[in-house]
Amino acid sequence: MEGVIAANLAAVRRRIDAAAEAAGRAPNSVTLVAVSKTHPAASVRDALAAGHRVFGENRVQEAQAKYPALREAFPDLALHLIGPLQTNKVRDAVALCDVIETVDRPRLAEALAREMERSGRRPPCLIEVNTGEEPQKSGVFPTVADDFIIECRDRIGLPIMGLMCVPPLDEEPALHFALLREIARRSGLGLLSMGMSADFEKAIRFGATHVRVGTAIFGARGEG
């Protein structure tokens, strides 16, 4: 499996580089977040052996089961939390994750700020924007995103560095990428986490700094 994952990583990286160059951007301006959710630690280790270092997990509990041992072997790995975060998992998330991409409500932001103050660890945070205003999804609606950014950054004191979105499956993602880019521009935020296996090249055209790719690297979920 190691050879397959290494080949997949190289293929995705080539596509990222080509998309960046087509958009007039430097290839190294786009970070590939390899989404390892539901895949075993062995698959992550194969990606690490191939030289990749940035990974994304949806659930703190799953990340706790995989990443402490991997970090011992590869201390330069970076772990992004890309799934919804419950307030009762905040302490674990701050301790384990290097970036938290899914800040989406004041109560969570306040809990994160308290834990960062307590622990002295301040992982960069992104605010998740529900660009499609889908009731079943987490994320702040675009209509209140500007105010929420100000609240998190200025009143609560979180290290907000950018925005993240997951467009609706049945809509043209470019519209959502453009919207996220505009909200980030208004607030002076530099990081844009958007684009997945099916649409990351389009996201790069709209300014993505981080693309979250799982299936194109590790295969269908849980295949390992």
What are these regions (language model features)?
Residues M1-L191, M196-F206, A220-R221:
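Conserved alpha/beta-domain cores
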Residues A208-G224:
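Gly/Pro- and small hydrophobic-enriched strand-loop and loop-to-helix capping segments
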